[in-house]
Regions:
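Structured surface interface patches that mediate subunit assembly and partner/cofactor docking
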Residues: 11, 41-47, 51, 136-138, ...
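Short beta-edge strand/loop motif at the mouth of beta-sheet-based domains
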Residues: 16, 23, 34-71, 81-83
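Solvent-exposed alpha-helix faces
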Residues: 33-34, 140
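Hydrophobic-ligand binding "helix-grip"
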Residues: 50-52, 61, 65-108, 118-120, ...
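Short, well-ordered beta-strand elements
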Residues: 113-117
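A conserved amphipathic terminal alpha-helix motif
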Residues: 119-149
Length: 149
């Protein structure tokens, strides 16, 4: 039997997104932690609360109760209010390693949030496109939270 390995470009993923919000760095960073944690949402806006322990080595996970759940990653670096970096499989239940970086920067009109998600793994067909569509939804929730305050 002959097996053909996928090309390297089929094993990697890079998603970069930016959003500007009319809010301070500190308020925006707090909103990001809230929206990634207890106020997180899944498909179609369904509540999907997560726990994000905001310190180096802290876990980002979904607690399903009775010692069940999903580990999405660990906080690799946090520098309030300008950086949150997480490594782990995130929402993917297959052989993958991800690095997720949120960088926040003060700009004239408020705060610029830059997301960079890089991953290496055995992605099922269509998965890359689905991942790229999810991150803007989180950004929209952060924007609504800080601009309504």
């Amino acid at each position: 039997m002959t097996a053909i390995a996928p090309a390297i470009e089929n094993l990697s993923l890079t998603v970069t997104e930016e959003i500007r919000v009319r809010s301070s760095l500190a308020t925006t960073f707090a909103a990001l932690l809230e929206e990634m944690g207890p106020s997180n949402e899944g498909h179609n806006g369904a509540p999907m609360p997560m726990t994000l322990e905001p310190w180096p080595g802290g876990r980002w996970f979904r607690d399903l109760g009775d010692n069940n759940g999903h580990l999405w990653g660990h906080v690799q670096a946090i520098k309030r209010p300008t950086l949150l970096e997480i490594t782990g499989p995130l929402m993917m239940s297959f052989a993958v390693a991800s690095n997720l970086q949120y960088r926040l920067k003060e700009v004239d009109s408020g705060t610029l949030i830059t997301l960079r998600h890089t991953a290496l793994g055995l992605f099922p067909d269509g998965y890359r496109d689905a991942l790229a569509q999810g991150w803007p939804l989180l950004f929209d929730r952060v924007r609504r939270r800080v601009e309504q305050a």
